[in-house]
Structures are given as structure tokens and as C-alpha cells.
């Protein structure tokens, strides 16, 4: 269970929809990016900067971000911890 995750430059994504955060340097991922562009499923959130991570969603959309994969992963962890804290408060009533 995740909330909205900041992927840079004021862009946020629904964390529950992301299935992978990967480094974009390999040839297969470059092909995946090109295929998504042809299919109209590429979302470029880099604001013209270098793509540092590719996020793959459960709807097969490919999201490009200028933020490092490790940074985005840390934001997922922080979001999960915050949601767990809120759920614990609710459980205690």
C-alpha cells in the first residue's frame, strides 16, 4: 500500500501501480522505452534532463524520471512507513 510518490519536478505517481524501478542504460530497456513510445504508453517526466530511471506500471506504461532509482525507492519506503504509522493510529483508536 503506497500513496503518491514524487518522481521529480512536482510530478507524482500512484505508488500502488508501479511494478519496477530500473536503470535505463541496458539495451533491452532502451527497446522497451522505444516500444512504449510507439504504443503511446511513454510518459516523460524528465523535463528535458537525462533519464536516470524508468518506472514500469501494471498498465504497461513506461515513465521516465530524472531521479535516481535509489532515490525513488527510498521515497516508496518512506511512504510505506508513513502509511503504516497512520494505520497503527487508526487501529489503536
Curated annotation (Swiss-Prot):
Domain of life: Bacteria
S-S pairs: none
InterPro entries to which the protein is assigned, alphabetical: RemA-like
Pfam families the record matches: RemA-like
Family under the similarity heading: Belongs to the RemA family.
Protein name listed in UniProt: Putative regulatory protein Fnod_1678
Amino acid at each position: 500500500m503506497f500513496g503518491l510518490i514524487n518522481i521529480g519536478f512536482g510530478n507524482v505517481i500512484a505508488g500502488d501501480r508501479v511494478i519496477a524501478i530500473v536503470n535505463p542504460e541496458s539495451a533491452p530497456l532502451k527497446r522497451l522505452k522505444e516500444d512504449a513510445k510507439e504504443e503511446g504508453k511513454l510518459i516523460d517526466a524528465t523535463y528535458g534532463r537525462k533519464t536516470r530511471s524508468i518506472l514500469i506500471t501494471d498498465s504497461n506504461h513506461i515513465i521516465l524520471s530524472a531521479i535516481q532509482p535509489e532515490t525513488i525507492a527510498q521515497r516508496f519506503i518512506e511512504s510505506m512507513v508513513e502509511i503504516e504509522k497512520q494505520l497503527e493510529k487508526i487501529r489503536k483508536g
